């Protein structure tokens, strides 16, 4: 029997099939931080949604998005276990399901604000999102495999393939975090199959921890009886854990892995440089989050001299999700104002006015400052744009631009010594740059500095 479908029915079925396959909706109005691999930041307008839609959710990828054939995909569980497993997605969905709302934030969110500047993607405020995650508890999968008494860490690996001789992106979780009932292996995001760019078909959800522990495209769980010493644990995603003088590098062996997020808030409205009218009611709005639940947000409109409590949206009270806050203000006189928002969590941690510096640019949580102009015809002075050199040496075309787009390079504000360290890292991963090419690159990077 032949059934004729109307066009709208066909489009509906095609869209439904795409959801089941975890296909991505187009990312709109996002800020590009890298084209190859693709890294996208959510603009401040995205902080108006309690649950961040997938099409507005930030994207962080160290390598290119892998192609996953679901019929062949398996989650392999091995190492220090009694019964190694090879689970299909259907196998996982037959286990008891768990669901929670949690913020996912890149460890480097806010890196662009560090002074002195530090290398890496120059994220502003938007390498973060809040979603409803559904899947199975990692603890249930480990229980099914049978942990041996020697188990110490859980090594996580995905289907993504390293570029050149770059080390495979593997992260480990301590046993305590892995067995936490809130740590999930998620297959759904906001009620739909995980989009490909967000880890389809399976990703780790480690609530309260930075995104480097939220492994995407998960294919392997290996139970270790000793601490994992791979590059992405011992050399990357580490920070001092204590105050250091700005510009002072700390040896890797004196740093520790990034784990818990820090309490912070973002002012989404009004925007920096906004023009307001005297006597016009203005609602100051934003989001606040951290590893612990947000307890309060205070707002100042005079640069931090006087603070007043903002209102938290009561319906958004969850253990790991962010909280929207708002503060009503009616400016009475023409002037420039500096608006600040400061969050406090249930553990008593308060957002600092000034940021502790670290060489990797991780865990930025200093109070944001938004400058608005009330009633004056004179606009707030614009920050001059950097003047970029137009001539790139061959070494840039043959090495840097094979993986990174030009904007990523232009966003950096590094010293010659910092660029030298970055080139050394790339040559260690297989980039071929002779001495003349190295000097040409360093001279070019010097010209990029404002």
Predicted regions and their residues:
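Extended, aromatic/histidine-rich regions of cofactor-dependent oxidoreductases associated
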Residues: 2-6, 11-75, 81-82, 97, ...
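Short, conserved helix/loop micro-motifs enriched in His/Cys and acidic residues
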Residues: 99-127
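Short cysteine/histidine-rich zinc-coordinating motifs and their immediately flanking basic loops
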Residues: 118-119, 412-417
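Mid-length scaffold segments of soluble, non-membrane domains
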Residues: 127-137
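C-terminal capping alpha-helices of c-type cytochrome domains
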Residues: 299, 431-450
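Electrostatic cytochrome c docking/interface patches
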Residues: 377-396, 428-429, 435-436
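The canonical Cys-X-X-Cys-His
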Residues: 396-407, 441
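Short microdomains enriched in Cys/His and/or Lys/Arg
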Residues: 420-432
């Amino acid at each position: 029997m032949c059934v004729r479908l109307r066009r709208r029915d066909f489009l509906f079925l095609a869209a439904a099939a795409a959801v089941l396959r975890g296909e991505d909706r187009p990312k709109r109005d996002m800020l590009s931080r890298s084209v190859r691999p693709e890294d996208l930041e959510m603009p401040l307008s995205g902080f108006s949604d309690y649950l961040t839609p997938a099409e507005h959710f930030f994207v962080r990828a160290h390598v290119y998005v892998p192609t996953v054939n679901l019929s062949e995909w398996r989650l392999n569980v091995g190492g220090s276990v009694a019964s190694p497993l090879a689970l299909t997605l259907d196998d996982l969905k037959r286990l008891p399901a768990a669901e929670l709302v949690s913020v996912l934030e890149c460890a480097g969110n806010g890196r662009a604000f560090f002074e002195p500047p530090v290398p890496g993607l120059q994220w502003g405020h938007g390498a973060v999102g809040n979603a409803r995650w559904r899947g199975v508890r990692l603890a249930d999968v480990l229980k099914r495999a049978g942990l041996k008494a020697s188990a110490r860490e859980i090594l996580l690996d995905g289907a993504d393939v390293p570029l050149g001789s770059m080390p495979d992106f593997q992260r480990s979780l301590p046993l305590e975090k892995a067995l936490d009932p809130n740590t999930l292996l998620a297959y759904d995001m906001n009620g739909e199959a995980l989009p490909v760019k967000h880890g389809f078909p399976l990703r780790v959800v480690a609530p309260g921890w930075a995104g480097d522990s939220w492994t995407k495209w998960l294919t392997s769980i290996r139970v270790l009886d000793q601490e994992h010493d791979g590059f992405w644990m011992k050399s990357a995603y580490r920070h001092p854990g204590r105050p250091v003088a700005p510009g002072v590098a700390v040896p890797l062996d004196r740093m520790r892995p990034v784990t818990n997020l820090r309490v912070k808030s973002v002012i989404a409205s009004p925007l920096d440089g906004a023009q307001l009218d005297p006597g016009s009611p203005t609602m100051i709005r934003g989001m606040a989050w951290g590893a612990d639940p947000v307890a309060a947000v205070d707002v100042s409109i005079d640069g931090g001299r006087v603070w007043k409590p903002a209102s938290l949206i009561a319906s958004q009270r969850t253990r790991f999700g962010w909280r929207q806050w708002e503060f009503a203000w009616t400016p009475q006189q023409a002037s420039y104002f500096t608006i600040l928002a400061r969050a406090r969590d249930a553990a008593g941690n308060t957002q600092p006015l000034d940021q502790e510096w670290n060489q990797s640019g991780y865990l930025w949580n200093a109070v944001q400052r938004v400058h608005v102009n009330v009633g004056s015809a004179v606009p707030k002075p614009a920050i001059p744009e950097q003047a970029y050199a137009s001539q790139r040496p061959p070494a840039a075309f043959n090495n840097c631009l094979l993986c990174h787009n030009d904007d990523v390079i232009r966003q950096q504000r590094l010293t010659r010594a910092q660029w030298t360290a970055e080139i050394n890292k790339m040559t260690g991963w297989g980039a071929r740059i002779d001495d003349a090419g190295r000097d040409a690159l360093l001279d070019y990077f010097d010209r990029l500095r404002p």
